[in-house]
Amino acid sequence: PLKAKYSIGAQIDLMKAHGISFLIMLVKYLGGEVKFTIDQVGLDMIDDAASSTDAADTITTWDARPSQGEPWLWKKVEILDRFEEGSNNIFEKTKRGVATFIHCGNNMARVIRQLDKFKPRGGVTNTPTGPMVIGTLDGRTVVQNPFKSTNYYTMGFRGPSYLYAGFIYCPYIPLFTTPTLITADLMAQKGFLSSAGFKVINAGLFCEGQISNLGGGYQTA
């Protein structure tokens, strides 16, 4: 649950000076914070599953340093082989799923954005907060998360039904808001509540990988 407190005077001043409804802005903002929290809880649970003993095999670490004289243009495409390795690890573990998404930290996203096959998501007009879908790579949804360890990434399979699920999010109360309460000192209060269930069903549909030495110069013999 979240609780917002504000003065009626501030609400009136904002409307008179700028024609902006403070209440509408508040509901949109705190509703976004609730969604952000739900997303982060789910992603953290998926990451924990991907690093567990029940997950598919860990992907071989990719050393991002080019060999002496090797152009970065060629070096960066090596990461595609790691993604195929991760997808095969999931298929080998489960015999039924391949990687359909990549959840990555900022350094991993930095590399992905430079790949020719990356297709950025269009139409993003809102200021990003927390994890966000940045596009697709070879048909896999790419999620960049500033709260994830910058050099780590998780690959996973999103199935078409519960029978193929690795993780389930079940909203019970999507978003509930209380009526606005105004006290005698002209202070207003409004509460927000959301409730959901989260469950890892099959950790084998996830695997973890990492990169190292991004921007670390050339490899030495």
Region roles according to the model:
Residues 1-17, 22-28, 73, 77-79, ...:
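Sequence/fold signature of self-assembling virion shell proteins
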Residues 22, 39-63:
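Short, glycine/acidic-rich hinge or "gate" loops at secondary-structure transitions
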Residues 36-41, 90-97, 221:
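Secondary-structure transition/capping motifs at alpha-helix termini
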Residues 100-105:
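Beta-edge loop/turn motif
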Residues 31-38, 42, 194:
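Structural signal for hydrophobic packing residues in well-ordered secondary-structure cores
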Residues 57-85, 89:
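Gly/Pro-rich turn-and-neighbor structural signature
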Residues 3-5, 35, 65:
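Basic side chains
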